[in-house]
A protein has these predicted regions:
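Amphipathic, Lys/Arg-enriched alpha-helical "gate/interface" segment within cytosolic domains
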Residues: 1-4, 9-17, 22-63, 67-140
Length: 140
């Protein structure tokens, strides 16, 4: 669905207001350099979900075929906001070629890259608990 970007689209697959998480699939070209997609994604989707208590975001990015970076201002801002609520942002299954610019700009500090090719075999709750458990184990 359209959220304001000319090149990146998304589908909100699932939202759990009790456990404060959502699963969103991204499709297309993520272009911060020209379109400032992260600003639109944060303002139009992230901020609206956070107003409703969502602090844990799972973005499935296996169909994001290109990534063009700019600065990290909105990544940092979003990271700070979800961290204040003990939340996190995960980018799941971003293609290796797409990850290069993402990693070069050190954006995984704000949105962690994770691989889980079989994500479709999980119900949303089980996908969330698997990711959340893995993140908690890394911290401890």
């Amino acid at each position: 669905d359209d959220f304001g970007s000319k090149t990146l689209y998304l589908k909100i697959i699932y939202v759990d207001y009790e456990l404060h998480f959502c699963v969103i699939e991204l499709i297309g070209e993520w272009n911060d350099a020209i379109e400032n997609d992260i600003m639109m994604l944060k303002r139009e989707i992230g901020d609206e979900l956070m107003k409703k208590g969502i602090s844990k975001f799972i973005f499935i990015a296996e169909n994001v075929l290109n990534f063009h970076s700019s600065d990290n201002e909105y990544y940092r801002e979003w990271y700070d906001e979800v961290s204040d609520e003990e939340g996190w942002i995960i980018i799941l299954n971003m293609p290796a070629a797409t990850q290069q610019d993402f990693i070069k700009k050190k954006l995984p500090y704000y949105m962690e890259l994770m691989e889980l090719p079989e994500w479709r075999s999980y119900k949303p709750y089980h996908l969330f608990t698997k990711i959340d458990t893995e993140l908690r184990q890394r911290i401890s």
